[in-house]
Design a protein with these regions (language model features):
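Short flexible loop/turn segments that cap and initiate beta-strands
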Residues: 9-12, 64-87, 114, 167-196
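Surface-exposed loops/turns
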Residues: 6-8, 53-54, 75, 95, ...
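Enriched for extracellular/lumenal, surface-exposed ectodomains of secreted and cell-surface proteins
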Residues: 4, 8-28, 66, 83, ...
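Interdomain boundary/hinge segments at the C-termini of tandem beta-sandwich modules
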Residues: 32-38, 135-140, 244-250
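Beta-strand-rich structural segments
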Residues: 1, 16, 53-70, 101, ...
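Aromatic sugar-binding surface patches on proteins
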Residues: 1, 95-102, 201-213
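Proline-enriched interdomain boundary motifs that mark the N-terminal boundary
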Residues: 37-47, 140-148, 251-259
Length: 261
């Protein structure tokens, strides 16, 4: 049938037109048929790429139309949404054919680009339809913790610093496929990145990290604030930082004034 054909029970009539041929007389034959409407999804949102943190809500919408009948909106039909193949809800289409759903991203949701499936199972006179989109990027906060520093280094000496960085569900930093994400912790002392050198700082399985910091020979004695920071190189983690304090010692010398040596 052509676009614009109304779905439902129809009568198909085949007719040989009278006097259309000198060899045949006119006749006709009728047969009952049922025309199913063809459906599709339009106006899917979000259309453009968005980033959503775990624990936050994301709004999704689509419009169910009858493509075989001039794309008329279909109201009152159930549409199911699936997040990475897992159903998250079934909602009816409104008067304009839109199916709107709000989904709270669980903290167990895998990170990265997520495929969302939109499904209409069909009805007694409408064929089913499905569509999918991959415009939602799931992201996690990170929490960085520094262990207490008990060392009291002298200028020119080395001390150790350690801690842990985790995602918002307590796991270490992982790739989308669940493998370890290569990452480093960066440091500054008293707001400066000079006066010391760092070795290590690699994030390991479970988010644990440690580093050795070598102070320069002229590093001043006193109380210091050290900051550890994670700056992500991927778009499915947010960065984080933390600070703690430690004391350093300097050198002293005694000069003889009297008697002169």
């Amino acid at each position: 049938s052509n676009n614009g054909t109304v779905r439902g029970a129809k009568t198909l009539v085949i007719t040989v037109i009278e006097e259309s041929s000198i060899y045949y007389t006119g006749s006709s034959k009728e047969s009952s048929i049922f025309v199913f409407g063809v459906t599709q999804f339009d106006s899917i949102q979000p259309l453009n790429a968005i980033v959503v943190n775990r624990g936050a809500d994301v709004n999704m919408t689509s419009q169910l139309v009858e493509s075989s009948n001039l794309f008329q909106p279909l109201s009152g039909y159930d549409v199911t949404y699936q997040f990475r193949g897992i159903p998250i809800g079934t909602v009816p289409t409104d008067g304009r054919g839109f199916a709107n759903i709000t989904h709270n991203i669980p903290f167990s949701q895998p990170l990265g680009i997520t495929t969302v499936d939109v499904i209409f199972a069909g009805s007694s006179d409408l064929l089913g339809a499905s569509a999918n989109f991959s415009t939602i990027n799931i992201r996690s906060l990170t929490i960085l913790v520094i262990d207490d520093i008990f060392d009291n280094p002298v200028a020119g000496e080395q001390f150790n610093i350690s801690g842990r960085i985790t995602s918002d569900n307590g796991s270490g930093l992982e790739q989308v496929d669940g493998t370890l994400l290569p990452a480093n912790i960066l440091f500054d002392i008293n707001g400066e990145s000079i006066g010391f050198t760092v070795s290590g700082g690699f994030v390991t399985t479970g988010g644990y990290w440690n580093a050795s910091i070598l102070l320069s020979p002229n590093f001043a004695a006193g109380n210091n604030t050290i900051e550890a920071a994670y700056i992500p190189a991927v778009n499915f983690y947010l960065g984080s930082n933390s600070t703690t304090q430690f004391d350093t010692r300097g050198f002293t010398e005694i000069r003889f004034i009297e008697p002169t040596l």
